[in-house]
Amino acid sequence: MSKLSEKEAFLFDRSIDQFEKGQYSKSLKTIQSVLKKKPKHPDSVALLGLNLCKLHDSRSALLKCGYASSIDPKSQFCWHALAIVYRETKDYNNSLKCYQNALAISPNNESLWYDAAYLQAQLGLYQPLFDNWNRLLQLDSSNLEYRLCFTLSAFLSGNYKESLEQIQYLISSCNLSPLVVSRLISFLPRICEHIENGSQTVLEILLMNQNSFLNNFNFEHIKADFAFRQKNYEESIYLYARLLIKFPNRLDYSEKYLNSLWNFYKSGGLALDLLLKRTDSLIKTFSEILQTGISVLIFLLSKNLDYDFCLNHLISYSMHHFIPSFISLLKIPLKTNDAFSKKLITMLSNFREGDSAKNIPTHKLWCTYCLCLAHYKLGDYEESNYWLNLAIDHTPTYPELFLAKAKIFLCMGEIEEALCSFKRSVELDKSDRALASKYAKYLIRMDRNEEAYIVLSKFSRFRFGGVCNYLAETECVWFLVEDGESLLRQKLYGLALKRFHSIYQIYKKWSFLKFDYFTQCAEDGEFQEYVELVEWSDNLWSSTDYLRATLGALTIYLLLFESKFNMYGNKAEEISHMSEVEQIAYAREDNKKIMKLQKIEEDKIKSYIPSESEEPLVIDEDYFGHKLLITDDPLTEAMRFLQPICWHKIKGWGFLKILSSKLYKLKGIIFCYYALTNNIEGLHQKANSLETSVL
């Protein structure tokens, strides 16, 4: 490998400088002038690849950087460049491998260790992440960012005692802002949950640093939680009461206050009559907060205590403020407690016949509507419909009444009547997006997609492909799932795959959120926020919407694997019986139709003039999903949906597991096949055969 001359080295350095300033086109031209004379200089080839990557030519960038690292496998610069290109293309596994190769050459390079930490955090490799930050801390023990990141990685990797010790050190010895100190102290209770006898230690730290809290109520919240854990219920009752006075809308405080009362009563520290007085006092004190009253009622019901006063208050308050939604909050006790259901209906009937309901029109409407909802929750649809008709006769312009009527008709199997009621509710309030979305959802479930698109178009912006692409762009997952399943039922497989792939891309985008936030959260002391992000991200691919999309995609790809003619949907059988010449002619005509429809959509874009505030409109070259259908390897495409799923987190979904096991078997992934079919014996046999072959 020849070295660069003095002039070439100068040009190489200039190209590096231009690259660091973001002048990628200039940097590219400069390095190309070097490569004209030294076409196999590895660092120059790698730099060329980096520029191509930044200029959005990732494929060429990977080829160049891969070629550079093959020319000189001992070049740290080449491996680093290849790692960056992989990282930019979000191939984090290969990027991390390249960083490891670079670190093997330059083990004391802080920049490489730092960059690798981002990848380990994204991939959930928390023990290597802990070791990584430990290494960086050894290289620069005075770096505050390194220590904060090391502390957070210690918690994530399960080294809780180390995390606790580091927080103590940070609070006592480092120059942190009051906000960061307050956040670190607030994170201590989360650590003590994992340390045996850690509560007392953490409480001592909290008391020593009480003045560090920017918000004293944050300290009292933590102190109250500690008191409850240590079964000091008298103290926790007092502290939660103080918190409720300050934050009356915090439902968790009212629930914890009630639990403290109950545990104090069970331990013999509180008489039953005092317990009931405390609950009555809670209702009276926060009489304007419906959620607090509901939580008290559910608490009294769950403990088999007298709840008449509470229920009377809730009905009276809801009647005077016309809040029928309180019935919906009682969904569980209505369905599981017959005595409560009968008492509620009796009380509502009495209020309806009372003087106040007769004198104030809205009171009568409220009572009638709530009786309808109560019977609906109990499954008595005829009685529910009777009361609802009375409410509609009283106030025929209230949209919620027609929405309730639509739901009742759906439960009774009267589909057309339900859709008419939905339509009427939307007409009464044309600006209600939520109401329109519910109507559209049921239209889609009835496979009346075009009507649903018209309803939703009133709340959409102009985009290529209309409302469907706009909702995909705005990550409206419920629409993509419902529309995809509807199109699948209609055997419009191309469009259905388009919806399911949109969901996959959305979830993939969400899964990358961890990448940028590790060091940011660590530096700001937002440990709790990052841990919550990790927990959310870990369950992302197990969500119901993604599993529904996966089930739909697998169904289509397995059909395509069975026969290529299934791509034609309802006409599959007819086309399969045609001669080869006729099939080719039909395919040609089908392609022409798709191209014509595609051109119509593109012409709409060309005639549209966007405003200055709007982003340029993007044309989808495969709007109808035709390219997704003509794949040569449908099984590999289907595997893309299965790869991120953690099956041990999924309960139920039997049909999805059956289709997945079929796919695994076809692809020869026997371990996954046996695991999904619960064939433990087959799993052991396969493992033993592999062990024997290795030996």
Curated annotation (Swiss-Prot):
Annotated GO CC locations: cytoplasm; cytosol; NatA complex; nucleus
Stated role: Non-catalytic component of the NatA N-terminal acetyltransferase, which catalyzes acetylation of proteins beginning with Met-Ser, Met-Gly and Met-Ala. N-acetylation plays a role in normal eukaryotic translation and processing, protect against proteolytic degradation and protein turnover.
Oligomer and partners: Component of the N-terminal acetyltransferase A (NatA) complex.
Name this polypeptide is given: N-terminal acetyltransferase A complex subunit-like protein C418.02
TPR repeats: 8-41, 43-75, 76-109, 111-143, 145-177, 217-250, 262-296, 365-398, 399-432, 477-510
UniProt entry keywords in alphabetical sequence: Cytoplasm, Nucleus, Repeat, TPR repeat, Transferase
Signal peptide (UniProt feature, chain positions): none
GO biological process: protein maturation
Gene Ontology MF annotations: acetyltransferase activator activity; transferase activity
Domain of life: Eukaryota
Keyword Transferase appears in the UniProt entry: yes
Subcellular location: Cytoplasm; Nucleus
